[in-house]
Amino acid sequence: MAYAYLFKYIIIGDTGVGKSCLLLQFTDKRFQPVHDLTIGVEFGARMITIDGKQIKLQIWDTAGQESFRSITRSYYRGAAGALLVYDITRRDTFNHLTTWLEDARQHSNSNMVIMLIGNKSDLESRREVKKEEGEAFAREHGLIFMETSAKTASNVEEAFINTAKEIYEKIQEGVFDINNEANGIKIGPQHAATNASHGSNQGGQQAGGGCC
């Protein structure tokens, strides 16, 4: 399907916080309770609609283990959005957020949109990190924040889509250079075809949109 833009995402955070489960819930609308540890990087994609335009999200799910950190760093470059995930039932995953955030900001473009996600909100009885703590961390570091449950799908759609909306707004404001794919944004055939139809009223033969 033709799209106006392609946005590249990266999902980061400690091992076991539910990164792969969030991706699977968003792309396939299913929950897999037992999931093998991600080795290196996994990939998923889905089309969404923002402001009447088709947007393709290309999502890279990274390994949380320290031994794979150098691989993860290479994927920060060329990402327009990042989902930084912790587990609300494990205080240590929240404590490690600063390290993940510093890593992301050091190796990514300065305009990358970061969504902080407190996952496993369905396990309220085992909560170790208050929602207010997540909100405060997000405020302090200029992040968007949501709590989600990959198991029940609560706020999963919203987390991915709200990140895309923020990226789209930055495009409209001219913050992102959309002609530089290093920013994690690619102009699609739908966008090119729309511009071509606006730019020519001479009745001449127009070339069709290319494929990507």
Curated annotation (Swiss-Prot):
The entry's function note states:
The small GTPases Rab are key regulators of intracellular membrane trafficking, from the formation of transport vesicles to their fusion with membranes. Rabs cycle between active GTP-bound and inactive GDP-bound states. In their active state, drive transport of vesicular carriers from donor organelles to acceptor organelles to regulate the membrane traffic that maintains organelle identity and morphology.
| Descriptive protein name | Ras-related protein Rab-2A
Q: What is the effect of changing Q65L?
A: Constitutively active. Interacts with GARIN1B
User: Motif Switch 2 at which residues?
Assistant: 63-72
Q: Which residues cross the membrane?
A: none
**Modified residues annotated as N-acetylalanine in this record:** A2
Q: Which cofactor does it need?
A: Mg(2+)
Where does it localize? Endoplasmic reticulum-Golgi intermediate compartment membrane; Melanosome; Endoplasmic reticulum membrane; Golgi apparatus membrane
Its assembly, as annotated, is: Interacts with PRKCI. Interacts with TRIP11. Interacts (in GTP-bound form) with GARIN1B. Interacts (GTP-bound) with HOPS complex component VPS39; interaction contributes to obtaining a functional HOPS complex that promotes autophagosome-lysosome membrane fusion driven by STX17-SNAP29-VAMP8. Interacts with VPS41.
Residue positions bearing lipid (S-geranylgeranyl cysteine): C211, C212
- The species this protein was found in: Mus musculus
Q: Which residues form a coiled coil?
A: none
Which portions of the chain have biased composition (kind: Gly residues)? 201-212
Q: Cellular component per GO?
A: acrosomal vesicle; autophagosome membrane; endoplasmic reticulum membrane; endoplasmic reticulum-Golgi intermediate compartment membrane; Golgi apparatus; Golgi membrane; melanosome
The EC number of this protein is: 3.6.5.2
